[in-house]
Amino acid sequence: MKQLRLEPVVQVRGEINIPGSKSISNRALLLATLAQGTTTLTNLLDSDDIRHMLASLKQLGVNYRLSQNNTVCELDGIGGVISSASAQELFLGNAGTAMRPLCAALTLGQGEFTLTGEPRMEERPIGDLVDALRQLGANIVYLKNDGFPPLTINATGLNGGDVEIAGDLSSQFLTALLMVAPLAKGSVNIHVKGELVSKPYIDITIALMAQFGVNVINHDYARFEIVAGQRYISPGKVLVEGDASSASYFLAAGAIKGGEVKVTGVGRLSIQGDVKFADVLEKMGADIEWGDDYIIARGSPLTAVDLDMNHIPDAAMTIATAALFAKGTTVIRNIYNWRIKETDRLAAMATELRKVGAEVEEGNDYIKITPPAVINTAEIDTYNDHRMAMCFSMLAFADCGITINDPDCTSKTFPDYFKQFASLQG
């Protein structure tokens, strides 16, 4: 197994241009596919999850051209639904942002489509989405365990009508349903059961749909109306914002060991909720400065916070490791959906924080972290989870440094993360 040793870092300073957002990249690729016209996507993320989406689209007959560095994609929309005369089997790795939307999109046309993935994907739930699609007439069969991939879609189109979908596990299910609703055979009225998690991710979806000419009526996140007769029209160009979750590591670095760290590609005009991570750092005592498309974090003594972070679940992970450098006990609440991500992130985070000496209480949907008097060095397991690797890079700011096991797992969203991280040192 590959290991990366991060030696103690005394101070960080510098500027990082954040790679494109994973959430926006895969949503935009699918909408561009369903749209009429050619779309040029710039600052597209070049990572495993996006490659899985692109490979699947190519297999389904979608034509696109990638720049040499894979960050500009010119894609010819099919102007409607995806159909296939022959049975197709698509491998989607561990990319939830490809599996969920494609599962929904492939019900719209005609054909037989089988969706598979890595072993961890077979443990990540999709039942809430499938239940909703079945209410609109979709024929979807589980191939192993009910409620989980792999699955086969026998597509004949999607009916309009009223549909209920659970919102308390993952917002990706609602996102997938919203994106396909305009191409159903009638108007779609979506009722959300339970409290909707990660609302800002739904805002991203609706904003992108609007860019492609489709209007969603949002009734306070409890009901969504998509009127029949709409279609996606390419806006010509789509700029993919920097990934706000990826920005969180550099902002935390600035807060803990700044110096001054500036991230560009996200800022006050961002459509991503995860930029609110900077507000949490500010509550902890960091000096934060906002621009339209940048955020600056400067170092300052940090104190613990006790907050509901359901609205920023991915970026909240960075608070868990930043908490090791804050005075007092930090509590991160309402984060049950950490458990259904690339790994069970609540269990993984608790395990690895204890390795470095933290006192940790792991609840069903919260984590309580008290830093040790002295942080211990350790070998951090990353569970094939990109965010675990990036979060624990913060331990380079301890006097003893840290060792990261399987550092290349960052390829899911940020292949050159550790190179960029190293550029801030000195």
UniProtKB/Swiss-Prot annotation:
SUPFAM superfamilies in alphabetical order: EPT/RTPC-like (SSF55205)
Active site: D314 (proton acceptor)
Keyword field contains Transferase: yes
Recorded GO CC terms: cytoplasm
One Pfam family matching this protein: EPSP_synthase
Binding site for phosphoenolpyruvate: K22, G96, R124, Q172, R345, R387, K412
Gene Ontology molecular-function annotations: 3-phosphoshikimate 1-carboxyvinyltransferase activity
Subcellular location: Cytoplasm
Enzyme Commission numbers on file: 2.5.1.19
Top-tier EC class: transferase
Residue positions binding 3-phosphoshikimate: K22, S23, R27, S170, S171, Q172, S198, D314, N337, K341
Catalytic activity: 3-phosphoshikimate + phosphoenolpyruvate = 5-O-(1-carboxyvinyl)-3-phosphoshikimate + phosphate
Broad class of the protein's primary localization: cytoplasm
GO BP, sorted A to Z: amino acid biosynthetic process; aromatic amino acid family biosynthetic process; chorismate biosynthetic process
Pathway it works in: Metabolic intermediate biosynthesis; chorismate biosynthesis; chorismate from D-erythrose 4-phosphate and phosphoenolpyruvate: step 6/7
Keywords: Amino-acid biosynthesis, Aromatic amino acid biosynthesis, Cytoplasm, Transferase
PROSITE patterns: EPSP_SYNTHASE_1, EPSP_SYNTHASE_2
Keyword check for Transferase: yes
UniProt-listed NCBIfam families: aroA
Membership in a protein family: Belongs to the EPSP synthase family.
Quaternary structure (record): Monomer.
Task performed by this protein: Catalyzes the transfer of the enolpyruvyl moiety of phosphoenolpyruvate (PEP) to the 5-hydroxyl of shikimate-3-phosphate (S3P) to produce enolpyruvyl shikimate-3-phosphate and inorganic phosphate.
Protein name: 3-phosphoshikimate 1-carboxyvinyltransferase
Lineage: Bacteria, Pseudomonadati, Pseudomonadota, Gammaproteobacteria, Alteromonadales
